Amino acid sequence: MNLPLASNVKHKRSTFKSSYLWNSLHAKWHYRFGKSEDAIVNWVDLLNRDSTKLRFNVVRNLIEAQAFQEARDYLERLEDNEHEESSELNYLLARCYIGQALIPQAKKKIEQAIQTKPQNSIYWDLLADCFLELGDWREAVKALDNSLRAAPKHAETNYRLGIIYAFHEEYLEALRCFQGCCQLKPHRSVYWEMKAEMHLQLEQLTDACHSFEKALRYGGTPDLAARLAYCYVQNNQIKKGIKYYKLTLKYEPDHYDSLSNLAAVYQNLNRSQDALNMLERAKNIYPKDPILLNNYAFTLVHQGRTRKAAEYYREALALTPDHPLILYNLCVCLTRKGNWQEGIDLLNLLLELDPNHSAGWALLGNIYDQTDQFDTAIDCFNKALKLA
């Protein structure tokens, strides 16, 4: 048996190590293990080799590594030569320009690519990116509509459209987009979640509940359970709401919104102690939340503990001195204790902040009525009724 000469084997190894395949694998290896600079050096070396073959895969790797200038240098060298891949060249150049925040140049290049291949949805997606960067969301929507015509089953394009519409408060259009997502990929939780949020915005509570149920089924998280609970409560399905708030708290005991909202549900059911228990847990998480302190005090009032409630109202006011609701609630508390003068002072402050606060005028009228200042009381009642 004839064995190859050692010098010949070494030569083959040397040749392989200088080959395109070896350097390409080497670059990917570097990039995979976080050595981006070494990978970029390898890729640029591959692009600088004399070859009639287009190296667009290498360019894509450079763009992914955010080496936009290196990719751009190669692509701009190719621009002078006519070839069949001009549309892809323009697309990749546009990606480089976007990466370098050169949006007008990117827009020009991607429009050139679209002229050559208008049926390519990826090109339309990039044009939409350009319009969004330029602040023209309606033109971005048109571009994404064209992308959908080119690729009708691309759920992610529908999702992008829905997000844009939702951001600009066009909730019905957004809903249609998210419905399309759910039809194309019915097991994606995030699509059902966004569909549910649009139903909520449109006050379609039953549909919102149904969509949140689907979202929870395909990707259950405590946040989704909490949103479903909120929907049920808003839809007057209180038992189901409580059930899902409890489910949320089972898996995430410190879920602040669920603790606060469940406390409100219990308070509305006259279960003040259960409400207080929830609020106590919430207070341990965020002890300086003025709205939480207000709700805590409100629950104490319903237990007849007005003195303690007043302390929490004052603590809340120290955090937000000009909050109308907290001011009013403290005034109610003071009135129940017969602390007329402080109540009058705080109500006057409230009415300076909000001169049309009808409940504030009515409460002030009641105080003056209790202190036998009847003419002043009548003036206050007239203002409460918008008669003066």
Model segments located where?
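Position-specific recognition of the canonical hydrophobic site in helix A of tetratricopeptide repeat
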Residues: Y31, I63, I98, L132, ...
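Short coil turns that delineate tetratricopeptide repeat
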Residues: K17, R49-S51, H83-E84, P118, ...
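Start-of-helix register in tetratricopeptide repeats
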Residues: L21, K53, E88, I122, ...
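Canonical positions in the second alpha-helix
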Residues: K12, W43-L46, L78, Q112-A113, ...
